[in-house]
């Protein structure tokens, strides 16, 4: 009995699309009309905060993001996607709704992500990281505390190192406890560029953290915040009070900020 060869010929963006459609056309039993979209992911090239980026997505959500400088061309991006996710990725006419705005504003909390293949721990880490606003920083320990795994700081770093959707899930906003930027999948210079584009003064952050991570209280609002929280940035000196811990601040009548959720709050 002869067996139909279902290996698609041809490479490249348009070639891949035609090749897979040819495979479906040769199937003995007619394929569902939407089978190609269910099997293959799609990719688009969009403007990013510091350079253009490749974005791959499925019906479930955004699956992969990569700065243009991290690959030679779209063929390298699509091949890397195929090897990592085990499925083809074909060109799309555009990115899903909301992606370009999320890259422009730095807020991707309204997007859906396809995180299949990530462990529950990794998904928890990514979900906590997604809540960090643009222009603000958190230490790895903060992420660990947010997911109720305060001792898993190194594991948090490893999970962020495997973030398939950087820039949108902003692992570049997570830094070391000493105030230095730390590692980044696309290199620390790219991490600095991204933070600089968000208005982060890394020299000031490092100088602040060298004195020890403190929380900042505002005696007008009664809130205590992380030092990089947007609420603490503009507190006048005569209303600004620093504490070593949230517990110490609570003893003075302060309430943890609902936005930055300082550790121990």
Model region roles, listed by residue range:
Residues 1-151, 197-265:
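Basic nucleic-acid-binding alpha-helical/helix-turn surface characteristic of O6-alkylguanine DNA
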Residues 129, 171-172, 194:
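Structural signal for hydrophobic
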Residues 137, 159-160, 169-170:
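Primarily hydrophobic membrane-targeting regions of prokaryotic envelope proteins
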Residues 153-166:
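Regulatory, non-catalytic segments
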Residues 167-175:
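Short Lys/Arg-enriched helix C-cap and helix-to-coil transition segments
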Residues 177-178, 188, 194, 250:
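A boundary/linker detector
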Residues 182:
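Aromatic, loop-rich ligand-recognition surfaces of beta-strand-rich domains
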Residues 186-202:
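A short, Lys/Arg-enriched interface patch at domain edges and termini
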